[in-house]
Amino acid sequence: MASSASSLHFLSLTPQTLPLPKPTSQTTSLSFFSLPPSSLNLSLSSSSSCFSSRFVRKVTLSDFDQIEDVEDGDDGVEEERNFSPDLKIFVGNLPFSADSAALAELFERAGNVEMVEVIYDKLTGRSRGFGFVTMSSKEEVEAACQQFNGYELDGRALRVNSGPPPEKRENSSFRGGSRGGGSFDSSNRVYVGNLAWGVDQDALETLFSEQGKVVDAKVVYDRDSGRSRGFGFVTYSSAEEVNNAIESLDGVDLNGRAIRVSPAEARPPRRQF
């Protein structure tokens, strides 16, 4: 009887211990696959300020197994800072429906895409119509500019360029001087400071054109290095547009920096002797 009881007791334990690994495995699997969506949503969610939708290489909706490459938002920001400014491309005249993932898919035809940013309005949550693409090499940057400048995406011809084009800067400055007089009144001019190094005239004009008619937009560059000095000026056609721009855009996040927008101080005219 004792032997029989011992046998029965042993058999009763077996079905209890065998299923234990199964629920543990299922629980681990479920929690693993639930992590990537929440992590991705953190980088794509809107905030009270202007925000951007980012696509970072190796972090895609399907690559769940590579989510460990980016553990939190700080790592992604640090990786972005390490990218050379020469590898960043400005993409303007974007359709409002184009997000960072769509832009990344398009530019991957020209090479390896490291990161994509689409800039969104802080109040409406809608795209501002421009963004930035970071490639892996200068050759890929040139290929992307040649391939996609003027490329029609959802009915809109993209404006694609990289770096500060010297010819365009000179033309912009000359155009501003030639427009002197009432239409280029310095009282209708705003100063824009704390600009990210990758922001050029096109990005500045696209952003400020939402508040009125932009007569001139200029980013100031260093003569020796050709790099942005981190500030610029935008001229409107009326004082009302200037006030709208200051109220709406001062403190807005543009490419990772909160820009400063204020009335530009008028310079005394130069006298020729």
UniProtKB/Swiss-Prot annotation:
<dbReference type="InterPro" id="IPR050502">
    <property type="entry name" value="Euk_RNA-bind_prot"/>
</dbReference>
<comment type="function">
    <text>Could be involved in splicing and/or processing of chloroplast RNA's.</text>
</comment>
<protein>
    <recommendedName>
        <fullName>29 kDa ribonucleoprotein A, chloroplastic</fullName>
    </recommendedName>
</protein>
<dbReference type="GO" id="GO:0006397">
    <property type="term" value="P:mRNA processing"/>
</dbReference>
<dbReference type="GO" id="GO:1901259">
    <property type="term" value="P:chloroplast rRNA processing"/>
</dbReference>
<dbReference type="GO" id="GO:0003729">
    <property type="term" value="F:mRNA binding"/>
</dbReference>
<keyword id="KW-0694">RNA-binding</keyword>
<dbReference type="InterPro" id="IPR035979">
    <property type="entry name" value="RBD_domain_sf"/>
</dbReference>
<keyword id="KW-0677">Repeat</keyword>
<feature type="transit peptide" description="Chloroplast">
    <location>
        <begin position="1"/>
        <end position="58"/>
    </location>
</feature>
<keyword id="KW-0809">Transit peptide</keyword>
<dbReference type="InterPro" id="IPR048289">
    <property type="entry name" value="RRM2_NsCP33-like"/>
</dbReference>
<feature type="region of interest" description="Linker (Gly-rich)">
    <location>
        <begin position="166"/>
        <end position="187"/>
    </location>
</feature>
<dbReference type="GO" id="GO:0009535">
    <property type="term" value="C:chloroplast thylakoid membrane"/>
</dbReference>
<keyword id="KW-0934">Plastid</keyword>
<feature type="domain" description="RRM 1">
    <location>
        <begin position="87"/>
        <end position="165"/>
    </location>
</feature>
<dbReference type="Pfam" id="PF00076">
    <property type="entry name" value="RRM_1"/>
</dbReference>
<keyword id="KW-0507">mRNA processing</keyword>
<dbReference type="GO" id="GO:1990904">
    <property type="term" value="C:ribonucleoprotein complex"/>
</dbReference>
<feature type="domain" description="RRM 2">
    <location>
        <begin position="188"/>
        <end position="266"/>
    </location>
</feature>
<feature type="region of interest" description="Disordered">
    <location>
        <begin position="156"/>
        <end position="181"/>
    </location>
</feature>
<dbReference type="InterPro" id="IPR000504">
    <property type="entry name" value="RRM_dom"/>
</dbReference>
<keyword id="KW-0687">Ribonucleoprotein</keyword>
<keyword id="KW-0150">Chloroplast</keyword>
<dbReference type="InterPro" id="IPR012677">
    <property type="entry name" value="Nucleotide-bd_a/b_plait_sf"/>
</dbReference>
